[in-house]
Swiss-Prot record:
Acts as a chaperone during the assembly of the 26S proteasome, specifically of the PA700/19S regulatory complex (RC). In the initial step of the base subcomplex assembly is part of an intermediate PSMD10:PSMC4:PSMC5:PAAF1 module which probably assembles with a PSMD5:PSMC2:PSMC1:PSMD2 module. Independently of the proteasome, regulates EGF-induced AKT activation through inhibition of the RHOA/ROCK/PTEN pathway, leading to prolonged AKT activation. Plays an important role in RAS-induced tumorigenesis. This is 26S proteasome non-ATPase regulatory subunit 10. The gene is PSMD10. Keywords: ANK repeat, Apoptosis, Chaperone, Cytoplasm, Nucleus, Repeat. It comes from Homo sapiens. The lineage of its organism: Eukaryota, Metazoa, Chordata, Craniata, Vertebrata. Signal peptide: none annotated. It comes from the Eukaryota.
Length: 226
């Protein structure tokens, strides 16, 4: 069938947005609402992925579990946050989705909101109690991702919710190292203005100023030292 992503018909219906057919199937056999497919995904995971809000709401009304993880550790909230499904994120949080759940990579939904530049979703997650300094398996935070990607508004949002600017990942890099390395000028200036250190060395014994390209290092040095 079209939209065949799963070995379970009910998951394919959820992914392709066929609400009436999905309702018929589930009302005939309630267990289908929570059955898992080859990826350990339920209909809820697939509806979140494709952004079918009505199907998500139908499944949530049935009381399906909101925190079940697929075989890569992704919850429905991870999927919805990464895919930019604002209304679905709101609905999942309203049903008690765990905002700091981690997947196999140690990532929370906020990590994906930050790297994909999902502003409204990041705010919803943070308002819902997301830890702004949660670290993935590389000890990187949402701030590392926003800085590397050059997501200026996301950095503003994270700063508003008191995210740290000086956490080091497994390579010893702070968000400022990454911003400098990727030539994210405005992002680097914002980080320094909010307390990011220009003196922290990474594992290669380099400071952010030493990885900065062009005239960025000088700009940042002047900001700090005058």
């Amino acid at each position: 069938m079209e939209g065949c992503v799963s070995n379970l018909m009910v998951c394919n219906l959820a992914y392709s947005g066929k609400l009436e057919e999905l309702k018929e199937s589930i009302l005939a056999d309630k267990s289908l609402a929570t059955r898992t497919d080859q990826d350990s995904r339920t209909a809820l995971h697939w509806a979140c992925s494709a952004g079918h809000t009505e199907i998500v709401e139908f499944l949530l009304q049935l009381g399906v579990p909101v925190n079940d993880k697929d075989d890569a550790g992704w919850s429905p909230l991870h999927i919805a946050a990464s895919a930019g499904r604002d209304e679905i994120v709101k609905a999942l949080l309203g049903k008690g989705a765990q905002v700091n759940a981690v997947n196999q990579n140690g990532c929370t939904p906020l990590h994906y909101a930050a790297s994909k530049n999902r502003h409204e979703i990041a705010v919803m997650l943070l308002e819902g109690g997301a830890n702004p300094d949660a670290k993935d398996h590389y000890e990187a935070t949402a701030m590392h991702r926003a800085a590397a990607k050059g997501n200026l508004k996301m950095i503003h949002i994270l700063l508003y919710y008191k995210a740290s600017t000086n956490i080091q990942d497994t390579e010893g890099n702070t968000p400022l190292h990454l911003a400098c390395d990727e030539e994210r000028v405005e992002e680097a200036k914002l980080l320094v203005s909010q307390g990011a250190s220009i003196y922290i060395e990474n594992k290669e014994e380099k400071t952010p100023l030493q990885v900065a390209k062009g005239g960025l290092g000088l700009i940042l040095k002047r900001m700090v030292e005058g």
